[in-house]
């Protein structure tokens, strides 16, 4: 509409239904913009739905031709990405201000056990035990570089004085070169089983050694999952 022609937009990747994204990256091919970048962003945000906001725009990097002179592909929002980072939010205190973006559990979890279990995720492994059936990935091998649980204080609690005890809010962070369909939600569901004491810390490693999706924990709600960063 703003450019006067149909534009094909390509995103950094797909997420499960109900999952949120911050700092999501996409690209499109176009002639030079007819507006200043800030004005273009303003006009875009004026016509986009309230649930979508554009924060920046810039020209994609020029492709670097290899020293051997072989073909170098243009920059691509999805295929040029080298890492993706997700966050999953859980709270243990009833909180109507965060309900839309965090999963409320009535009983606390053992973060120390869950963090020790995270060690099995680090490195290059077959994560098919956490992949939802029907995925069309050519391989289930992913390389995880970070996985951890930690407590945090949400903004409304620190700024507005909403009651908040130590450990009432926790977040899981995981970063990898790629992810399988439903992978993060299945990992979190399995971690919760460990945090509740229903499974040993070694369970994650055992699942990855030969378990199937039906052996792992349940898929947790998508509303509390955020694609938070795409690395290039």
Predicted segments — roles?
Residues 1-232:
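Structured-RNA-binding interfaces characteristic of tRNA pseudouridine synthases
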């Amino acid at each position: 509409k703003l450019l006067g022609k149909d534009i094909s937009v390509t995103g950094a990747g797909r997420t499960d239904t109900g999952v949120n994204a911050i700092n999501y990256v996409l690209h499109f091919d176009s002639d030079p913009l007819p507006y200043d970048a800030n004005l273009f962003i303003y006009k875009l945000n004026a016509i986009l739905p309230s649930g979508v906001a554009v924060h920046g725009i810039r020209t994609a990097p020029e492709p670097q031709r290899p020293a051997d002179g072989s073909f170098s592909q243009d920059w691509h929002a999805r295929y040029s990405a080298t890492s993706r980072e997700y966050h999953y939010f859980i709270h243990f205190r009833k909180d109507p201000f965060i309900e839309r973006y965090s999963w409320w559990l009535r009983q606390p979890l053992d973060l120390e056990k869950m963090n020790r279990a995270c060690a099995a995720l680090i490195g290059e492994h077959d994560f098919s035990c956490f992949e939802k059936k029907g995925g069309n990935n050519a391989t289930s091998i992913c390389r995880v570089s970070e996985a951890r649980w930690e407590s945090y204080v949400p903004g409304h609690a620190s700024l507005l004085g909403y009651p908040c005890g130590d450990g009432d809010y926790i977040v899981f962070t995981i970063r990898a070169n790629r992810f399988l369909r439903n992978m993060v939600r299945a990992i979190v569901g399995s971690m919760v089983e460990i945090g509740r004491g229903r499974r040993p810390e070694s369970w994650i490693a055992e699942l990855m050694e030969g378990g199937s999706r039906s052996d792992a924990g349940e898929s947790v709600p998508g509303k509390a999952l955020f694609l938070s960063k795409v690395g290039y």
